[in-house]
């Protein structure tokens, strides 16, 4: 990977998996080329990815942003290519809430055990507190909600089910729907 061009098959695959049109994908490809060109290399480095996504996730800490980069770097080569970039944007904007919550779970399940355990839950709570404070929620509202869905550990399925039932939680973690549907991100 690592390139900024999509084959017809890749474009068709992306359109099938996302709600993006052919025109959307063309625009995102152009945006990718501009955003990823700062270091004259193909694709987003970890630093460029974090800088780009920091706009939407400005309250997230550096370690969480690095984990996000690694999740989207699906081939593990240290560079986000155009296909990985478009997938990341879709996940952050137009993906169904349950997909976003599954992604959030994967982001914090650092040991890949299939469960969020005490230390991982603590990291999630820290992000929720920061995001919720920025949105005007009290710290206690954020912590109360997180601890209402789990005590010691929770599976991915339980997390997605519980969290998706709370609009407040979805807003607190900054995975809100894009209210302006004509914008791609």
UniProtKB/Swiss-Prot annotation:
Q: Tell me which residues make up the EF-hand domain.
A: 60-95, 96-131
Matching CDD domains:
EFh (cd00051)
Q: Which residues cross the membrane?
A: none
Recite the UniProt keywords alphabetically: Calcium, Metal-binding, Repeat
Query: Which InterPro entries does UniProt cross-reference here?
Result: EF-hand-dom_pair, EF_Hand_1_Ca_BS, EF_hand_dom
**Record bears the keyword Metal-binding:** yes
Q: Which GO terms describe its biological process?
A: regulation of signal transduction
Where Ca(2+) 1 binds, per the record, is at 73, 75, 77, 84
A Pfam family (short name) is: EF-hand_1
Residues at which Ca(2+) 2 binds:
109, 111, 113, 115, 120
A GO molecular-function descriptor: calcium ion binding
Q: What does the similarity note say?
A: Belongs to the recoverin family.
Listed name of the protein: Calcium-binding protein K-like
Q: Which organism is it from?
A: Dictyostelium discoideum (Social amoeba)
């Amino acid at each position: 990977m690592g390139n900024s061009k999509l084959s017809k098959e890749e474009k068709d695959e992306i359109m099938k998996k996302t709600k993006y049109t052919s025109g959307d994908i063309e625009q995102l490809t152009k945006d990718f080329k501009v955003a990823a060109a700062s270091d004259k290399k193909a694709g987003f480095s970890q630093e460029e990815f974090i800088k780009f996504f920091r706009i939407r996730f400005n309250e997230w800490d550096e370690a969480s942003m690095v984990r996000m980069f690694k999740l989207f770097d699906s081939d593990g080569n240290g560079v986000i290519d155009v296909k990985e970039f478009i997938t990341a944007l879709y996940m952050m904007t137009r993906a169904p809430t349950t997909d976003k919550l599954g992604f959030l779970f994967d982001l914090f399940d650092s040991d890949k055990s299939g469960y969020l355990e005490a230390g991982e839950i603590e990291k999630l709570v820290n992000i929720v507190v920061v995001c919720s404070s920025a949105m005007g929620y009290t710290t206690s509202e954020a912590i109360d909600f997180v601890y209402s869905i789990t005590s010691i550990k929770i599976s991915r399925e339980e997390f997605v089910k519980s969290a998706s039932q709370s609009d407040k939680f979805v807003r607190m973690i900054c995975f809100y729907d894009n209210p302006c549907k004509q914008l791609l991100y």
